[in-house]
Amino acid sequence: MDDNKAKALKAALAQIEKQFGKNTIMHLGDDSAALDVDVVSTGSLGLDIALGIGGLPKGRIVEIYGPESSGKTTMTLQAIAECQKQGGVCAFIDAEHALDPVYARKLGVNTDDLLLSQPDNGEQALEITDMLVRSGAIDMIVIDSVAALTPRAEIEGEMGDSHMGLQARLMSQALRKITGNAKRSNCMVLFINQIRMKIGVMFGSPETTTGGNALKFYASVRMDIRRIGAVKNGDEIIGNQTRVKVIKNKMAPPFRQAEFEITYGEGTNHLAEVIDLGVEIGAVGKAGSWYSYGDEKIGQGKANSVLFLKENPAIAEEIEAKIRAEKLGVKDDSKAAVVAETNEELASEPVQ
């Protein structure tokens, strides 16, 4: 850039900062906050890896949708539990008026610290959300669900009245306000959504989500969660086999997917994921039905191996660290120590 352009740019930047305040405009490289995105784990190791950044991004809009009883609320409650473990403050906007505090506690949520609102209508729910976001004190807000955000006019009207596009307009207006505020306060806003069928679709999927198109555009991450099978103990069904597909991702490559088990009353079977992904990267050995870690056999069959890891959490954490290092490029301290030691040995050897 020549001197005249540089002077003109400097004058323009000074004028902008004078009029709108400091840090209104800056070089992208100067803003470390723009480069480092804080994440909250989903509670599923496979899904954290599929998201490409190790979890759900803070300061962004996130949407999770799927059919009934597919695990949408379970996944969001697990994310709340993980956020609370990091010392975060969370809020749950229960528009469906269906949150079970006993189940939330089973999934690890500290219900004493969880803020809960059960609003009367959609406008109230989204206004409460915006006020919480602007407070700067909340790390994560879950709205359950978009379909239940009923506009005030619809609630006050008669049962057969037509209210075409009211909810879509409400969502569009609210998201215009919430998106910028969420980024400034580093608060994640997670919307749970339901599926509806479009009439008369001949080609392609007839499925669509409720609340219009605004959420599809404003969301940085969109996840499609489906039940693909049952988890059985003998003849008794004890959980769901679940698949989550990352449909949209502004933080990493999209269209990755994760499969895991959700056990009724317990949530994601995290240790089973650790074993499966450990085998995949070679950290856990598998010979026939036996699993091993290093020179030690940890169990015959996955169920026994899960019990071993439950009794030995240090080994489970070690395997998980190796999986994250391999799949996400997260620094593995044990590997770094070995590399440093090897480099020292090579440096001490005489050059031939």
Curated annotation (Swiss-Prot):
Kindly report the protein's main subcellular placement as a broad class: cytoplasm
Q: Which domain of life is it from?
A: Bacteria
Gene Ontology MF terms in the entry: ATP binding; ATP hydrolysis activity; ATP-dependent DNA damage sensor activity; damaged DNA binding; single-stranded DNA binding
Listed A to Z, the keywords are: ATP-binding, Cytoplasm, DNA damage, DNA recombination, DNA repair, DNA-binding, Nucleotide-binding, SOS response
Q: Tell me the compartments it is located in.
A: Cytoplasm
* Physiological role: Can catalyze the hydrolysis of ATP in the presence of single-stranded DNA, the ATP-dependent uptake of single-stranded DNA by duplex DNA, and the ATP-dependent hybridization of homologous single-stranded DNAs. It interacts with LexA causing its activation and leading to its autocatalytic cleavage.
Record protein name field: Protein RecA
